[in-house]
Amino acid sequence: HEYKRQMMNVLHILAEYNRILEDNVYAENYYPKTYIFGAKAAPGYKRAKLIIKLINSVGDMINNDPRVKDKIKVVFLENYSVSIAEKLIIAADISEQISTAGKEASGTGNMKFMLNGALTIGTLDGANVEMLEQVGEDNIYIFGLKADEVAARVKYAGTDEVKNIYSSNASLRHALEQLVDGSIVPGSNQMFRDLYQTLLFGDYGFPD
């Protein structure tokens, strides 16, 4: 589902990758990270499948770049299941629970990560709400808009405010342009154009 915002996660990874290549001081002090994704998409959910394709393509680009081989990696676990989760949860250092506030049902996966020692960063959504109440704000890292704030900002989709953010944030702009400049999948600048268009011009997160 788009509301889980793994698209945002991928853009963040691209921004980190770009900065490692462009900023020697940042690269020298960068703490190595492996980003692990596990997901499925309904057969007819084209945009969700395209996001999975993007995750894998970004992973191929980064994992095969010798300049960052000891700094950043991207892994996608196919057919994510309980059996895979049993191995992943106990090994994770950070649990990213970043769904759009007001969209996620209250599951237990994030609780399992926390109980096994992973630090949780995320939005005030789903079971994060109950976890915050139980562990306190010093033990969970909450960021982003609350559900009512998200609802109030939907009207800005595709407006000049989106374009202003795009224009003023060079790191974000670079990552977005990589979706359509052929750098992720050499020779193809159209594969992820739908994601680029919907983020900038208005219907990201709505049914495709």
Segments from the language model and where they lie:
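C-terminal, helix-dominated tail/subdomain
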Residues: 36-39, 93, 146-147
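Long, K/E/R/D-enriched contiguous segments that form extended
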Residues: 1-85
